[in-house]
């Protein structure tokens, strides 16, 4: 199941400010000259991409589409950053790929580009690829990349080297007897892998660390965090085990959804997680809040062994979540669970004393899923058909037709521009009885787990046999019509595909002994 990344759009309403250090005087001066300088961003394409990745030990690549508004906004900042970094030692190279160009689409597929702009850091000839998670303005890009190009883990030689560990952020430190051996090698490997997410350090002096103990049994990995236990240790140096330890330890046991900007990084991590999510929403400013909080935290401890992440949200700060899930304030206090299959379970007007029992019913599989859906339209006569959550599977997967479906938001400017184009394409194809162009308001309806909707508009093309492809083609009516005509299945092709699919289980099912 793909991550339900629409959840992340809930956080766009938050005032998430990615702060960056002020530009140095020489960088500011260089920025003033940027407009007159030659383009510093490399233009890559299918023919030169591999050579460029192999040539540059460190390169940031932007996958963009010419029609993408966010890409257009990023372009001048990206170019300015490239010029500011052009003389950096070691070299920091910025490049771009038009992922909408037909010949470059295999590159976009290879590197799992699912939205625009997508930025990825390529290190060591492409052996290490990471998502870029830094700011989107020039000075912020520069400072972030300078940090990324240095060592993945810094040695802590003296107490003053460790003062940064108390800055209220998450830090990971490896404590060793010597900087060699399997444990140290594995630690550095993980630091390189996760360097875009966390700061790593290493030392042979445990007493240099805050709350340190010179007698600590080494080697170990110590994670510093500004919540819960404040310090947690692990002695398992298997890379996979270490990664799981860091992931589990770097988010509060209960994430708080309020207006405090210090909580925003944890919210992003929470909503990006694949794990089931339990969310209690209520008014933080009313009297019962403390009793609910106490009961909820008690439930979290009781179910601590379960694979679920917990959140408590203030109604005032959580309006995006309410709108996304089709909830109303008069339903609060409420608990909402979204599981790994995108199914949702709702308990409205919950009482503090009911929280544990309701969660137990969820874990025991006794609850009925809740689905947000607009009513199925009584009349649906326009060229572009309106689809809702309650009938999307019937229209898209069970209609035996070729369906181009748009996931849109009513407030989205790009969606508004696309609407008349889809109308024109649908009108052109009205005589094609095996073709449907449809749309669904993804803010008013739950998006099925089969679709990965990261932004608006998102379009998918689904054939009668069930083949599902993210549409990344042109945005004119003619281009859409041409794409559908070239890629649609005939009744015969769909039947053949269905027959082949039906035969697969029999061909692959292992022989079983029957008693």
Swiss-Prot record:
Regions of compositional bias (Low complexity) in chain numbering: 494-509
Annotated positions for site Lowers pKa of C-terminal Cys of first active site: 136
GO biological process: protein folding; response to endoplasmic reticulum stress
Domain Thioredoxin: 26-150, 346-489
Chemical reaction(s) catalysed: Catalyzes the rearrangement of -S-S- bonds in proteins
Keyword check for Repeat: yes
S-S bonds: 68-71, 412-415
Chief subcellular location: endoplasmic reticulum
GO CC terms, sorted: endoplasmic reticulum; endoplasmic reticulum lumen
UniProt similarity note: Belongs to the protein disulfide isomerase family.
Leader peptide range in chain numbering: 1-25
InterPro entries per record: PDI_thioredoxin-like_dom (IPR005788), Prot_disulphide_isomerase (IPR005792), Thioredoxin-like_sf (IPR036249), Thioredoxin_CS (IPR017937), Thioredoxin_domain (IPR013766)
Keyword tags: Disulfide bond, Endoplasmic reticulum, Glycoprotein, Isomerase, Redox-active center, Repeat, Signal
Functional summary from the UniProt entry: Participates in the folding of proteins containing disulfide bonds, may be involved in glycosylation, prolyl hydroxylation and triglyceride transfer.
Cellular compartment(s): Endoplasmic reticulum lumen
Gene designation: PDI
Glycan attachment positions: 283
One Gene Ontology MF term: protein disulfide isomerase activity
Protein name: Protein disulfide-isomerase
Stretches for region Disordered: 494-515
């Amino acid at each position: 199941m793909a991550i339900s990344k629409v959840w992340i759009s809930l956080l766009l309403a938050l005032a998430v400010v990615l702060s960056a250090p002020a530009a140095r005087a020489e960088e500011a001066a260089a920025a003033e000259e940027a407009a007159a300088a030659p383009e510093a961003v490399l233009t890559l394409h299918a023919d030169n991409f591999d050579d460029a990745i192999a040539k540059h030990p460190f390169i940031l690549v932007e996958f963009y589409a010419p029609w993408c508004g966010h890409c257009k906004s990023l372009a001048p900042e990206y170019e300015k950053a490239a010029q500011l970094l052009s003389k950096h030692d070691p070299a920091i190279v910025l490049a771009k790929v038009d992922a909408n160009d037909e010949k470059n689409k295999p590159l976009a597929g290879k590197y799992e580009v699912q939205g625009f702009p997508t930025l990825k850091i390529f290190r060591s000839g492409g052996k290490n690829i990471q998502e870029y998670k830094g700011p989107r303005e020039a000075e912020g890009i520069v400072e972030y990349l300078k940090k990324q190009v240095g060592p993945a883990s810094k040695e802590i030689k003296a107490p003053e080297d460790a003062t940064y560990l108390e800055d209220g952020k998450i830090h990971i430190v490896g404590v060793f007897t010597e900087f060699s051996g399997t444990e140290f090698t594995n630690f550095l490997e993980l630091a390189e892998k996760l360097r875009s997410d966390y700061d790593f350090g290493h030392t042979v002096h445990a007493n240099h660390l805050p709350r340190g103990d010179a007698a600590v049994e080494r080697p170990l990995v110590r994670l510093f965090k500004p919540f819960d236990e404040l310090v947690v240790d692990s002695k398992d140096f298997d890379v996979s085990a270490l990664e799981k330890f860091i992931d589990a330890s770097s988010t509060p046991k209960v994430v708080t959804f309020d207006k405090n900007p210090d909580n925003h990084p944890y919210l992003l991590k929470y909503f990006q997680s694949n794990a089931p999510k339990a969310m209690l929403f209520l008014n933080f400013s009313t009297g019962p809040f403390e009793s609910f909080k106490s009961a909820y935290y008690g439930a979290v401890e009781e179910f601590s062994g379960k694979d679920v992440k917990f959140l408590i949200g203030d109604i005032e700060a959580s309006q995006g979540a309410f709108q996304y899930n089709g909830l109303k304030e008069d339903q609060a206090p409420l608990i909402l669970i979204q599981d790994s299959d995108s199914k949702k379970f709702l308990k409205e007007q919950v009482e503090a004393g009911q929280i544990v029992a309701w969660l137990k019913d969820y874990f025991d599989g006794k609850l009925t899923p809740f689905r947000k859906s607009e009513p199925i339209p009584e009349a649906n006569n326009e060229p572009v058909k309106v689809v809702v959550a309650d009938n999307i599977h019937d229209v898209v997967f069970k209609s035996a037709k070729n369906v181009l479906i748009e996931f849109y938001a009513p407030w989205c400017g790009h969606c508004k521009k696309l609407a008349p184009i889809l109308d024109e394409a649908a009108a052109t194809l009205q005589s094609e009885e095996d073709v449907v162009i449809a749309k669904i308001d993804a803010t008013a309806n739950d998006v099925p787990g089969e679709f990965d909707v990261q932004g608006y508009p998102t379009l998918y093309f689904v054939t009668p046999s069930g083949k599902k492809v993210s549409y990344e083609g042109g945005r004119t009516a003619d281009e859409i019509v041409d794409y559908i005509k070239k890629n649609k299945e005939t009744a015969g092709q769909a039947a053949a595909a269905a027959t082949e699919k039906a035969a697969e289980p029999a061909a692959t099912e292992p022989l079983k002994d029957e008693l």
